[in-house]
Amino acid sequence: TAATPNGRHAGEPLNDGGISPTHGDDTKGATAIFKSAGKLCNVRAGHGSVLNQLLHPSIFKGEESDKVFGEYMRSICDCGVWETQFNVLTKEDLLQAQKHPDEYRSLVVRVAGYSAFFTVLGKGVQDDIIDRTSLMQY
């Protein structure tokens, strides 16, 4: 793809899924992302529209984390977003897997509509996953 006016360089992906935000443009948190995605008309998206989110593991700490995540998922569906994929990792974990692939051979990630072992993906795809915004709150 060609470069775009927002500073994205030629050859870089537009986004990592049908309705995922462009890297770095998701600055208002996870809730704002799915509310925006829910406003899209996906009637002509014959193969579906996926929303990818990289969640920081700290979101799942605490007594209420399961309940809060369930409410978050219900809210996503209430907004009309029907296909959401999550990676629950830190950027540091992904960078370490890139540097030491033998130690992370079993690390599976959601790419964009499919899962793959992180260490067998090409560096460009790995970098794209690492560049996703790690959301630390809903």
Question: Predicted segments — roles?
Answer:
Residues T1-Y138:
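Acidic, glycine-enriched catalytic cores built around paired aspartates
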